[in-house]
Amino acid sequence: IGRVHDDALGKFYAQTMAKEGTDFVNPPVPGGELPTSRSMIFVSPDGERSMNTYLGISSELGPDDVSDSVAGSAEILFLEGYLYDKPKGKQAFERAVELCHKAGGKAGIALSDPFCVDRHRDDFRRLVKSLDYVIGNEHEWASLYQTDLSTALEQAAADAGLVVCTRSGHDVIVQRGDEQAVVPVTRVVPVDATGAGDQFAAGFLYGLATGQSLSTSGRMGCVAAAEVISHFGARPETDLKALFHKEG
């Protein structure tokens, strides 16, 4: 579910998603109000990146863009916190979560950006209480609950049920109620850190979807993230399923 213009970038995005095997159910918007979003990313020699992002038409995502059949049939719904800035984006999230839950699915979010959390802290806190899982890094959790990390995760687990905290090269913490898994991370110097958070979420959610334990799901997220930071670009260049099997 998303929103792109019918310009060159929008058509390329929709076509590439379909080519990769993912249905992009919202066709490019003819004469859309803004151009398709884009991001210019500068990668320094230490692999860290600085992003200059224009959200464009994506920021206009609203409840009418949420497909009943898609959100209402999802076993796992994943929301992207970057689109939570505008009222219509918040309405879209709430509608998608409601449709997913009515059908018995699980809905969650990646907090995405501590500055976005700062801007909408109260709304995020309300949203988290309606979700089944939340993924964030240590800075985003601290921003959301305005306390130390341990206390923030305890509060988050009480609110959302399942919470994940990534810590940029340090152990990942996964907590559900009183159950906590600490997943070790092998520190490496990245070639390009772009996409690390997205790929962690992908690996982790694939683990949950296939019935893996919290620790195994966390490990799968780490394996996926490690692959994408080993080369330039935000998409994996290796068969991740094969990599999961290789890593045990």
Regions found by a protein language model. Give the residues of each.
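Conserved phosphate-binding/catalytic region of the ribokinase-like
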Residues: E98-L99, L149-G248
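Ribokinase/PfkB-type carbohydrate-kinase core domain
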Residues: H5, K11-P30, S37, I41-V182, ...
